[in-house]
């Protein structure tokens, strides 16, 4: 009996029964999550949150003040102070001008308006401006209009293009070079003939851009070209004079020179 009592731990507990069970406790309990249905999720997401309602400030009407320079109204003093930077020409600082500033401006304006008196010079300037405004506008009749006349039928046209189109109707005349401008300068005079006494030839003085040689009658466009051409005739004349033994550029010899030359020739002949 002693062995059985020592081995059983519940032997000392009175009223202990073998049918009593102790509750079991879990060391790591887990919380259950409740799943929301689709209807509950849609209703919760679509429902708007209430926005805070801002009530108007009863003192806002007292804060809003107009600008003393331009009259614009602003809802806050901060905006009004920022707007006053747009008026740097004012002589005072802040929102409201000083009390004596308005009276001084009014007095200056009244004194300036009463003391202003137009001078005689200003009266003259005003009268001149009125005369210029009421004067007649000068017409363009005094201007000379350029006109072009057709040589074939003597019709007058106001432009060179109109005359060119008209000249196309004349089949006997090619081009429009026969037209004449009424306002152009008169034609140059005909060439004059001058007789050269040394050579007995007539020299023509041709006016205009054409330059004619008086020896071979060749025409050149410029005086420089004619001068270069004339050197050919001068060189030919010099060659002919050298062949004849007479140089026109050297002065004639005296009687003493001729006798000396003859004596020298005689001596050389011996």
Curated annotation (Swiss-Prot):
Any one GO BP annotation for this protein: regulation of DNA-templated transcription
Tissue spec: Expressed exclusively in pollen.
GO annotations of cellular component type: nucleus
GO molecular function: DNA-binding transcription factor activity; zinc ion binding
Low complexity biased stretches: 106-115
Localization terms from the record: Nucleus
The organism's place on the tree of life at top rank: Eukaryota
Major location (coarse): nucleus
Biased composition regions of type Polar residues, renumbered to the chain: 1-28, 36-48
Tagged with keyword Endoplasmic reticulum: no
UniProt entry keywords in alphabetical sequence: Metal-binding, Nucleus, Repeat, Transcription, Transcription regulation, Zinc, Zinc-finger
Region (Disordered): 1-64, 95-119
Induction: Activated by the transcription factor DUO1.
UniProt zinc finger (C2H2-type) residues: 65-87, 148-170, 211-233
Cysteine-cysteine disulfides: none
Pfam families: zf-C2H2_6
PANTHER family linked: ZINC FINGER PROTEIN ZAT2-RELATED
Subunit structure comment from the entry: Interacts (via the EAR motif) with TPL.
Function: Mediates the regulation of male germ cell division by DUO1.
Protein name as annotated: Zinc finger protein ZAT2
Protein species of origin: Arabidopsis thaliana (Mouse-ear cress)
Annotated gene: ZAT2
